[in-house]
Amino acid sequence: MASTTLSDLPDVILSTISSLVSDSRARNSLSLVSHKFLALERSTRSHLTIRGNARDLSLVPDCFRSISHLDLSFLSPWGHTLLASLPIDHQNLLALRLKFCFPFVESLNVYTRSPSSLELLLPQWPRIRHIKLLRWHQRASQIPTGGDFVPIFEHCGGFLESLDLSNFYHWTEDLPPVLLRYADVAARLTRLDLLTASFTEGYKSSEIVSITKSCPNLKTFRVACTFDPRYFEFVGDETLSAVATSSPKLTLLHMVDTASLANPRAIPGTEAGDSAVTAGTLIEVFSGLPNLEELVLDVGKDVKHSGVALEALNSKCKKLRVLKLGQFQGVCSATEWRRLDGVALCGGLQSLSIKNSGDLTDMGLVAIGRGCCKLTTFEIQGCENVTVDGLRTMVSLRSKTLTDVRISCCKNLDTAASLKAIEPICDRIKRLHIDCVWSGSEDEEVEGRVETSEADHEEEDDGYERSQKRCKYSFEEEHCSTSDVNGFCSEDRVWEKLEYLSLWINVGEFLTPLPMTGLDDCPNLEEIRIKIEGDCRGKRRPAEPEFGLSCLALYPKLSKMQLDCGDTIGFALTAPPMQMDLSLWERFFLTGIGSLSLSELDYWPPQDRDVNQRSLSLPGAGLLQECLTLRKLFIHGTAHEHFMNFLLRIPNLRDVQLRADYYPAPENDMSTEMRVGSCSRFEDQLNSRNIID
């Protein structure tokens, strides 16, 4: 009797199985062993990202007939205008070929340096509903005002609902006239994303008012702007009121100051100044947006007495689930234990982020933990009055719901203190971000902080004791059998469900102390992101030869890494005497990476801002070639063709790409290593190899 195979399963069961497999490579593997699954996969797949060289688009198969979401932004050579290198007649033929292979496209992502590529592609799919444009290069001066957007509204006006410009560098004066010119199309837009990180000043007040008037049916609006009253046409009370009046259907609103986008870790001093946004206007805005579900206001200047407005937010926007506040003061004063105030009254929140709130105290955190009983995600940044006691209490109160915690730029919360604070959920947390700030005498510092808190805030300590009695949390008994004098567990922690870890570390520091802080047992950690930031110029040579990546080998399931040295600044060329150039720093950062069993790596090389160069060095290429298990490698910078050839020694490497996804991206191919011919030759060699599996 013949054995039963996967193909013998009924189509209904096979379809259910296929819907449970989300990983693209796993689906492709299943397609190789089952003809039924192959036919089902090809006929039902709706999302497709095309990689490979743009010159080979004619070889795209025509079996994916149900594709509705098509991403062409990662074609190689990355960052070049699609089809521009081909003769005009070939360009039209390739555009028609794409239409034939994917006839039902409704969502399109494309990298465009000029409107010519849009003029070719968009007529092929007149029923497009969503378009995402990408461009990190400077806008060409010969493009007429609004020229980047006219093809979109001209060819897709009948069905267009969503426009995403979050990764598209453009001039802010380009968009409002086009929206006015195509008023009927603008009126149908429900999603507009203008949160572009490459802006220096962002959208002006009058431009935001014009945009929201042209798009009265917006449900999602994200924009980068300037709240600083010292700037011309800054965003203040009038602008916020106009947004609420013109777009009352908003469910998602993000308004972020460009200074926060340029330097997200900045902690303003007492001289930061006040914004032109008042609590009274915020109450009016919240009243005008009753459907709001997600709100981000990162103002960059102090918003005083915001607690009253946040109390109104709870009563006016009952559907609110996600809230992020930057530079808001008085978010939760917690002056009375019996009465919750400020953001603590927003009991429906599932995600809360508080940034640079100078007057937030431990008692405020405890009140938030009591009031926001549905929190699954919590982020705190730049809150200097918060200590390990308050954060630990808040985490304990929400131990049954919290799975994602991010702690950064809090002077009283170094690495050890942060981990002690979230210890009550060490067996439940799935995603974590902390700063790697090492302390020589951690216990003494923690004890000192507690004593200082007791001396300065007796009333708050009394309230803290009452909170212990009322809440009856007993995390010590749950998580450990013995505790030290500060109430922290002395047994080893096991981070059973931790899957993603994000770390920030200052340049010149070492990663090696990380396991000794209590993060040594993470059996299910799959992905890690490490951001190294700082100025190498003037730094002494590190005492040890390596940064410490080899210490990550103790995580058995670690397979994905993002190593971001993009904000590490140094000398790309010859360094002054007694200093290290970036190639030596890159050797310091990457030494030991070959000991990790990584399958995917995103790497941002350090940069020299004076010459706008982020390039993989010879030591860097030599160390990356030691990652023998890599399958995907994306270098967010440039590299010599000779250095790229080192990577061909990685046996199973399938996908490699150079991406200058930073502003301004290198403009002239002759001044960089990212020439079309170089990239094409390397990809040809990569694709000609036999891959074992």
Curated annotation (Swiss-Prot):
Residues 445-465 are annotated as: Disordered. Keywords: Auxin signaling pathway, Developmental protein, Leucine-rich repeat, Nucleus, Repeat, Ubl conjugation pathway. Gene3D superfamilies: Ribonuclease Inhibitor (3.80.10.10). One of its GO terms (cellular component) is nucleus. PANTHER family: F-BOX PROTEIN MAX2, PARTNER OF PAIRED, ISOFORM B-RELATED. Part of a SCF (SKP1-cullin-F-box) protein ligase complex. Interacts with SKP1A/ASK1. Interacts with CUL1. Interacts with SMXL6, SMXL7 and SMXL8. Interacts with D14. Forms a complex with D14 and SKP1A/ASK1 in presence of strigolactone. Component of SCF(ASK-cullin-F-box) E3 ubiquitin ligase complexes, which may mediate the ubiquitination and subsequent proteasomal degradation of target proteins. Promotes the senescence. Is necessary for responses to strigolactones and karrikins. Contributes to the selective repression of axillary shoots and moderates the branching by regulating negatively the auxin transport in primary stems, in an AXR1-independent manner. Required for the progression of leaf senescence mediated by methyl jasmonate. Required at each node to suppress axillary bud growth. This is F-box protein MAX2. It comes from Arabidopsis thaliana (Mouse-ear cress).
